[in-house]
């Protein structure tokens, strides 16, 4: 390393190899493992475990993803109803235990999934006596009712009941006053004269929380593990909610990447990754780069294992037959390989590649 003066009075540090702007992100540890775990229906409630992350990144990413999931994902909701023989929400219904205000409140909690972005009109026709739930609506073409056990109303004997339920897609929370004003102005031409607007909560995510735990790579334990707990209404799965939120953030942050130099470095990296190797470039790294104990390193060296590509093709039985190599060393190697999404017993076609030494240097430098 040397110290240089650029002529303007400022002093900079010069290193042996040229610094690339892509080093800002390439030199950071990226998550190598994302697991979806939970009890019961993973399409509605699950935990996503992401590791390893650089220290502090779990808090940064967890906060950003939680905020986007709770505020910016689009979903589906009821925005209005029409009940046969009813002109406004203060009307009482003969033979129905609930009044119209109760119906509006109950139906505002109806959760559906539309297969298109167009609004739809669902129909509910029932005859008493008995409790009427969302199951009476049934699934229509292009729409699925998700909470069919939702209580809607209770009918008396021989009471005929008919209503329309208006659903559409949207984002966040829209108060009934907005849809009421839209219907009066004629902006919502599909509704009838007896339209009664409801408050619409579109967010498909019911609850998000995250916690931060310690993670490790080899002997180093100063990494983060991010555990995100997500509960949805069933119109989107928890892992999809996280993925979409990440895509929203990616799209918004893209505007900040205005530097041509940054764009150029990103493009070169993508081009290289797209055209390079038929297998994980980690296989080209030497086992000397792994954070292993001295005993494990010596065992690999004595067994003439130079590259990670050589190592992963060994089975656990092969490794345990190596002199002085025990179960503790095996667990250590399994853990390090798992952090790179690799494992023992892999089959690597066409290994080793030609000019492996040059390829190894190239990817080590990058």
From Swiss-Prot:
- Region of interest: Alpha C-terminal domain (alpha-CTD): 274-366
A single GO molecular function term of this UniProt record = DNA binding
| Domain of life (superkingdom) | Bacteria
Q: Which UniProt keywords apply?
A: DNA-directed RNA polymerase, Nucleotidyltransferase, Transcription, Transferase
Gene3D superfamilies the record matches: 5' to 3' exonuclease, C-terminal subdomain (1.10.150.20), DNA-directed RNA polymerase, insert domain (2.170.120.12), RNA polymerase, RBP11-like subunit (3.30.1360.10)
What are the BP-aspect GO terms? DNA-templated transcription
Q: Which reactions are catalysed by this chain?
A: RNA(n) + a ribonucleoside 5'-triphosphate = RNA(n+1) + diphosphate
One GO cellular component term: cytoplasm
**What are the boundaries of the region Alpha N-terminal domain (alpha-NTD)?**
1-260
Record-listed E.C. numbers: 2.7.7.6
Q: Per its UniProt record, what InterPro entries does this chain match?
A: DNA-dir_RNA_pol_insert, DNA-dir_RNA_pol_RpoA/D/Rpb3, DNA-dir_RpoA, RBP11-like, RNAP_asu_C, RNApol_insert_sf
Subunit structure, per the record?
Homodimer. The RNAP catalytic core consists of 2 alpha, 1 beta, 1 beta' and 1 omega subunit. When a sigma factor is associated with the core the holoenzyme is formed, which can initiate transcription.
Domain comment as written in the entry: The N-terminal domain is essential for RNAP assembly and basal transcription, whereas the C-terminal domain is involved in interaction with transcriptional regulators and with upstream promoter elements.
Q: Which protein is depicted?
A: DNA-directed RNA polymerase subunit alpha
- UniProt source species: Anaplasma marginale (strain St. Maries)
